[in-house]
Each structure stands twice: as structure tokens, then as C-alpha cells.
Amino acid sequence: MRVLAAMSGGVDSSVAAARMVDAGHDVVGVHLALSTAPGTLRTGSRGCCSKEDASDARRVADVLGIPFYVWDFAEKFQADVIDEFLSAYARGETPNPCVTCNQKIKFSALSAKAVALGFDAVATGHYARLSGGRLRRAVDKDKDQSYVLAVLSAEQLRHAAFPIGDTPKPQIREEAARRGLAVAEKPDSHDICFIPSGNTRAFLGERIGVRRGAVVDADGTVLAEHDGVHGFTIGQRKGLGIAGPGPDGRPRYVTAIDADTATVRVGEASDLDVREMLGRAVVFTSGTAPSGPFECAVQVRAHGETADAVAELVGDELVVRLRAPLRGVAPGQTLALYRRDPDGDEVLGSATIAGTSR
């Protein structure tokens, strides 16, 4: 099998590439250049997508004895990931750019180019498992990345390979060291790769600009003014610009954002509880939608807990009714659907949260 190994320069993708070589596949390594603008992406070992990371990936490819290329995806990354990230926050939503990158860059643009060049699969260092076309959680629950892959279609998964999903992260580092890979102890990246400072609020403010509005309580009383709804997300407690807790002494949280009126509403923690979610841009990883209501477990954050629910496709929207309230759900978040399984929860699909109700 001809395999294109996506190599970020980190330990996970390096071991993934090595395992594909060991399996006897015809492997070619590729690093994605996602920006040419100074200061746009992280540099050094703290993040991904830098020149240093490209060099690390090349050195690993040399050790493995495979061809290596750097492909320029900067323009598409800007349009499909960064610009959409900015637009979503301007709409008062809370997107996950890693989800968007997987859906539109790694397993769409990159995968399409790979297939056009005669490759059978794109292998990445994601912590997830594929078995019989079914996407499952990784063995290492703490590192599991199935959530950010739940947006992938059956066709996208058909050309994907996740060689390290059956191994805990500490063992991946040990394996890299045994193989003599210099990235064995390279730190993991945790922040958004295109925000060098790690300050998302400042990044958004510089690019979206000022659109002043009001912070109000449940009664509509104006508590403060703000410079733009992009500085807030549902469940936020700090940085609200208001003078301390409510009259009853309880902390106040962002409970709703109206981008049309630039209004941010705050309330108590209990106001964050939701029992129903509405999803758009629905994807079922099998390629076939269930014919009626179905039991599932849902997850709304990359490393969040799952909650039992009943979901149903109504037209082109997904209605999800929770068995118990879920707190702090924000429009724009990815809603991943799972089928519980002791051998590793299976991903059923996903949707983008369009609205919630209590």
C-alpha cells in the first residue's frame, strides 16, 4: 500500500510514520507549511507548523529512509481554518479550529491530493483507532483524539490510517527513543497553532475589531460595556468587566451571546444547564443516517465528559435530548456522537451546535 505520512515534526506522527514503514508499506513523508507570515504560527518545540518542526520531520524521515516533502497549504489554511475561526467568534460562537483543520485540510485537501498522486491512505499521529471502517476511541483515554475526528465522513475515513491509536503515549515516547528519533522527548503542543501568544482574546480583538455592546443580567439591566462579543464564550466567568458577583453573592457566568445586538447576558451557574441541543452540518461516519431516534453518548469538548442522550435527525438538523442536564454548551462547538463500547467507544458522527434549550 502506498502511504502518505503526514509528519508534523512531533513524536506521535514520527512514530506513526515509522510503524507504516515497519508494516512494509511504500511510505512518503510530507510536512504541511500552513503559513509564511512571521509570527502567525508557533515556533520552536512548543507548538506545531514552524520551520523548526519541518526540520525535525525531515530528520525523522532521513532516519526512516523515506522520501520527504514540504507542501504549501498556507492559503487554504488561512481561508478554511483561520478566517472561519474569526467569523465564528464574530457570530458569537465557540469553534474548535483543530476540528476544522482535520475536516478541511488534513483529511480533505491533503487526502485529495494524496489520492490524486496514487496514494492509498494518509497516516497521521492522531490518537484514535479504525477497525472495519469504524472510528473508535484510542486506548490512551487521556490522549484520545476521536472527538476532533468525529467530523470525518465515511469516504474520508476510507483513506485514513491511525497507526498509534492502540498504544499509550508513554510507550510511544519509549518507542521513539528506541528508534533513535530525536523528537522522542519533544514537548506536546497544547495551544492553537496559529495564535503564537496563546492569548486568543487578543488575537481575535486585533483581527475582528471593536464593536461595543452591553453586558446585561437576566432582567436586562446593563452591568458593563464590552468591545466585542468575540471576547466571550458561554460559561466564561472571568474577564466580564463587571463588579464582582451578583447581589446574592453568587458568581456570574456568560449564559448567552447575541452577536446581532452585541449583547452578552450573564447569570448563575444553573442558567448554564441545557437539556436539548440542535445541531447542523450533520455527519454520520458510516455514511448512513439512522432511520429514527437512537441512543448515544455525546461529547461537546475535546477532552470533556460524555453524557447519555437520545438523538434524532429531523430534516437536515440533529435534535439531541440529554438524559441529564449538561453545563456550559456553546453554539459553534462540535457535538460528537458515540456508541458506548467496553472495547472502545465507537464514533457515530457529529454536528455543529446551532442552539440549546433548558
UniProtKB/Swiss-Prot annotation:
Give the active-site positions. Answer: 101 (nucleophile), 193 (cysteine persulfide intermediate)
Q: Which GO terms describe its molecular function?
A: ATP binding; tRNA binding; tRNA-uridine 2-sulfurtransferase activity
Q: Where in the cell is it found?
A: Cytoplasm
Q: Please name every pair of cysteines joined by a disulfide bond in this record.
A: 101-193
The catalytic activity, as recorded, is: S-sulfanyl-L-cysteinyl-[protein] + uridine(34) in tRNA + AH2 + ATP = 2-thiouridine(34) in tRNA + L-cysteinyl-[protein] + A + AMP + diphosphate + H(+)
Name its GO BP terms in alphabetical order. tRNA wobble position uridine thiolation
Matching entries from Pfam families are given as:
tRNA_Me_trans, tRNA_Me_trans_C, tRNA_Me_trans_M
Identify one Gene Ontology CC term for this UniProt entry. Answer: cytoplasm
Residues reported to bind ATP: 6-13, 32, 125
Query: Which CDD domains has this protein been placed in?
Result: MnmA_TRMU-like
Locate the site labelled Interaction with tRNA.
126, 333
Chain residue ranges for the region called Interaction with tRNA: 143-145
Q: What is its EC number?
A: 2.8.1.13
List the keywords (alphabetical). Answer: ATP-binding, Cytoplasm, Disulfide bond, Nucleotide-binding, RNA-binding, Transferase, tRNA processing, tRNA-binding
The protein's job, in short, is: Catalyzes the 2-thiolation of uridine at the wobble position (U34) of tRNA, leading to the formation of s(2)U34.
**Similarity field:** Belongs to the MnmA/TRMU family.
Query: Which NCBIfam families did the record assign?
Result: PRK00143.1, trmU
Q: Which HAMAP family match?
A: tRNA_thiouridyl_MnmA (MF_00144)
Q: What is this protein called?
A: tRNA-specific 2-thiouridylase MnmA
